């Protein structure tokens, strides 16, 4: 059967990673029938990842409350009365203790967040020590500390920080309805400083803040058209906090959330797409659909900064029911391994007279690339 190369659907499953997505193309993906969208997202997910492996992170608030920013969704903003108890920067020993417990519960990455506009010079030595000591536990490290200049990014990288989280939150058009104390360009500048320092980028957004679908399209377009896709893309569902301006916005349709996850997977096929804030509000069935749509990372544990998160034991039971398992970071594919998997998929499809595009009409033979448990390299099988 000839390849279908002219439609947005078939272009989405081209194995080449793109940075030139048009809004009309992303609109077309969102508009697909739900089953078709999930099928395409799942096909791309399987081409790049073990579909039953989920990267597990734990997030700890190392400095809580009194943030000078006015993000309308955030309980930590000093602009709103959310009755959140303020806390100073945690002691390094306490952070290491929490990281050790997270590792014992199956987390491979430990993320540390501070409610700052930007790190202060006097706090940096403690932050850098946290990174070093958590790394000594054999865990990956991630931080979110607000805006970074070049010097701060360089210091974090030198200490060994693996990932830096700095979300775009929403589309450029809707951004001013949510935040006024920090510009969109401020966020993009921090991301550039992080990337230039050699760290990996964790960057996503929040949905369900009263935005339109066009804003979700715009957010994903911004992420997918960055010079390098974020290695990790957290998709947050708004957690409504009493006292914040967004406490009473209408709920987002769960299927629209799943669609957002699926489109993120298609646009950024090599990135980890993380179910982040808001999982507490999702039932197991909605989470299962997200995993099917290409989500392959979660935050694990009872707290996500200052909001509830599903308990670790519940996550373990859900993983068992779905037949999925935490990803061992030692078996994560390198960039070269991802490229090898891409080339293998392309070659196989060419041999099947399907051009460079996945043929959604022929479901009898699908290439499945998984990671060999011993080598961490991709292998190709058929099913």
Swiss-Prot record:
Protein name: Biotin synthase
HAMAP family the record matches: BioB
Pathway, per record: Cofactor biosynthesis; biotin biosynthesis; biotin from 7,8-diaminononanoate: step 2/2
Tree of life domain: Bacteria
Binding positions ([2Fe-2S] cluster): 111, 142, 202, 274
Annotated binding of [4Fe-4S] cluster, by residue: 67, 71, 74
GO biological process terms on file: biotin biosynthetic process
GO molecular function: 2 iron, 2 sulfur cluster binding; 4 iron, 4 sulfur cluster binding; biotin synthase activity; iron ion binding
Function field: Catalyzes the conversion of dethiobiotin (DTB) to biotin by the insertion of a sulfur atom into dethiobiotin via a radical-based mechanism.
Segments forming domain Radical SAM core: 52-276
InterPro entries hit by this protein: Aldolase_TIM, BATS_dom, Biotin_synth/BioAB, Biotin_synthase, Elp3/MiaA/NifB-like_rSAM, rSAM
Subunit structure: Homodimer.
Keyword set, alphabetical order: 2Fe-2S, 4Fe-4S, Biotin biosynthesis, Iron, Iron-sulfur, Metal-binding, S-adenosyl-L-methionine, Transferase
Gene expressing this chain: bioB
The keyword RNA-binding is assigned to this record: no
Cofactor: record remark: Binds 1 [4Fe-4S] cluster. The cluster is coordinated with 3 cysteines and an exchangeable S-adenosyl-L-methionine.
Organism: Alcanivorax borkumensis (strain ATCC 700651 / DSM 11573 / NCIMB 13689 / SK2)
Catalytic activity field: (4R,5S)-dethiobiotin + (sulfur carrier)-SH + 2 reduced [2Fe-2S]-[ferredoxin] + 2 S-adenosyl-L-methionine = (sulfur carrier)-H + biotin + 2 5'-deoxyadenosine + 2 L-methionine + 2 oxidized [2Fe-2S]-[ferredoxin]
Class of this enzyme: transferase
PROSITE patterns: RADICAL_SAM
Family, as annotated: Belongs to the radical SAM superfamily. Biotin synthase family.
EC code: 2.8.1.6
NCBIfam families per the UniProt record, alphabetical: bioB (TIGR00433)
Cofactor: [4Fe-4S] cluster; [2Fe-2S] cluster
């Amino acid at each position: 059967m000839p390849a279908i190369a002219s439609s947005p659907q078939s272009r989405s499953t081209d194995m080449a990673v793109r940075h030139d997505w048009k809004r009309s193309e992303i609109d077309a993906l969102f508009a697909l029938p739900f089953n078709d969208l999930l099928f395409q997202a799942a096909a791309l997910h399987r081409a790049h990842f073990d579909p039953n492996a989920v990267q597990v992170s734990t997030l700890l608030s190392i400095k809580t409350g009194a943030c000078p920013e006015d993000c309308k969704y955030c309980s930590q903003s000093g602009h709103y009365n959310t009755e959140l108890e303020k806390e100073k920067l945690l002691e390094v020993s306490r952070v290491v203790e929490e990281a050790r417990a997270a590792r014992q519960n199956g987390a491979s990455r430990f993320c540390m967040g501070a409610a700052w506009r930007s790190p202060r010079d006097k706090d940096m030595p403690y932050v850098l020590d946290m990174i070093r000591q958590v790394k000594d536990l054999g865990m990956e490290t991630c931080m979110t500390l607000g805006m970074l200049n070049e010097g701060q990014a360089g210091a974090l990288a030198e200490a060994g920080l693996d990932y830096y989280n700095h979300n775009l939150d929403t589309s450029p058009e809707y951004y001013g309805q949510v935040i006024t104390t920090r510009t969109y360009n401020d966020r993009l500048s921090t991301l550039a400083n992080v990337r230039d320092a050699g760290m990996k980028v964790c960057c996503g957004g929040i949905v369900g803040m009263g935005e339109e679908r066009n804003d979700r399209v715009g957010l994903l377009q911004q992420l997918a058209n960055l010079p390098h896709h974020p290695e990790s893309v957290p998709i947050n569902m708004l957690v409504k906090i009493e006292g914040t301006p967004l406490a009473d916005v209408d709920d987002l349709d769960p299927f629209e959330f799943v669609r957002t996850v699926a489109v993120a997977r298609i646009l950024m096929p090599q990135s980890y797409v993380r179910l982040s804030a808001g999982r507490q509000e999702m039932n197991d069935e909605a989470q299962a659909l997200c995993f099917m749509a290409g989500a392959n990372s979660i935050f694990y544990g009872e707290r996500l900064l200052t909001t509830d998160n599903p308990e670790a034991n519940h996550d373990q039971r859900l993983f068992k029911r779905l037949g999925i398992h935490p990803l061992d970071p030692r078996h994560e594919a390198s960039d070269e391994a991802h490229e090898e998997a891409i080339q293998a998929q392309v070659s196989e499809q060419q041999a099947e007279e399907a051009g460079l595009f996945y043929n959604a009409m022929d479901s009898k033979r699908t290439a499945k690339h998984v990671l060999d448990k011993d080598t961490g390299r991709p292998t190709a099988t058929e099913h």
